[in-house]
């Protein structure tokens, strides 16, 4: 299945590192609601170690937070999935705290998006 054929934008970790949040948001049509699929394995494991398959070199937690926050202000977010949290692989509560920060930003972005007309 080709995601782009169906109008789905997919960004790899490397693409996220090369692009600014605003450049990514500009690729999303204003009149189409956004669904965010967030795989925690792709976030820098030094900041979020609580995953099964950590990938070094991924975007920072602050970058992902900034991107989600900006999306919530500029586009209508339809929904979010948040996958691959694995508490058994956490270092203390580092990954838990990072995940909670992400969830807080996601909830805030979803609340902000309710103010945006499609």
Regions found by a protein language model. Give the residues of each.
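Conserved alpha-helical scaffold segments that buttress catalytic/binding sites
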Residues: 1-118
């Amino acid at each position: 299945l080709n995601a782009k054929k169906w109008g789905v934008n997919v960004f790899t970790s490397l693409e996220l590192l090369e692009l600014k949040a605003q450049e990514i948001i500009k690729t999303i049509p204003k009149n189409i609601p956004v669904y965010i699929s967030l795989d925690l394995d792709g976030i820098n494991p030094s900041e979020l170690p609580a995953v099964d398959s950590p990938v070094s070199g991924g975007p920072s937690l602050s970058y992902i937070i900034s991107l989600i926050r900006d999306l919530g202000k500029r586009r209508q977010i339809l929904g979010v999935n948040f996958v691959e949290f694995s508490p058994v692989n956490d270092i203390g509560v580092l990954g838990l705290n990072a995940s909670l920060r992400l969830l807080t930003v996601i909830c805030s972005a979803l609340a902000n998006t309710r103010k945006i007309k499609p």
